[in-house]
Swiss-Prot record:
UniProt family annotation: Belongs to the GAGE family.
Compositional bias per record (Acidic residues), positions renumbered to this chain: 32-45, 87-96
Entry's transmembrane regions: none
Gene name of the encoded protein: GAGE6
Residue numbers spanned by region Disordered: 1-117
Basic and acidic residues bias: start-end ranges: 103-117
InterPro entries noted in UniProt: GAGE (IPR031320), GAGE_fam (IPR008625)
Tissue-wise expression: Expressed in a variety of tumor tissues but not in normal tissues, except testis.
Upper taxonomic lineage: Eukaryota, Metazoa, Chordata, Craniata, Vertebrata
Other comments on record: This gene belongs to a family of genes organized in clustered repeats. They have a high degree of predicted sequence identity, but differ by scattered single nucleotide substitution. Their sequences contain either the antigenic peptide YYWPRPRRY or YRPRPRRY which is recognized by cytotoxic T-cells.
Stretch forming the signal peptide: none
UniProt protein name: G antigen 6
Domain of life where this protein originates: Eukaryota
């Protein structure tokens, strides 16, 4: 008796043909510009000045936040994470640190204890 299982070899899938950008046509720089051109008003409509919405919002925020007092700074972020004395997973800048190379690690002396997380 011989075992006839499913083959692990799969035929390569046919690739879909995609036209390269040269064949589609040249790119038009006006489609990719960062600045948006303002729409020209029609003859019957008067031209209105458009303000940047972010600039208008800043003016409103200044008046509202003036009477509220100062906001807490980075100290409040540290209070959310109490120190446990074991900071193996995070480095000083909050990013993960790779474990040290075992060849470079010094073995602790008999009288010293090594903290373990």
């Amino acid at each position: 008796m011989s075992w006839r299982g499913r083959s692990t070899y799969y035929w390569p899938r046919p690739r879909r043909y995609v036209q390269p950008p040269e064949v589609i046509g040249p790119m038009r720089p006006e489609q990719f510009s960062d600045e948006v051109e303002p729409a020209t008003p029609e003859e019957g409509e008067p031209a209105t000045q458009r303000q940047d919405p972010a600039a208008a919002q800043e003016g409103e925020d200044e008046g509202a936040s003036a009477g509220q007092g100062p906001k807490p700074e980075a100290d409040s972020q540290e209070q959310g994470h109490p120190q446990t004395g074991c900071e193996c997973e995070d480095g000083p800048d909050g990013q993960e640190v790779d474990p040290p190379n075992p060849e470079e690690v010094k073995t602790p002396e008999e009288g010293e204890k090594q903290s373990q997380c």
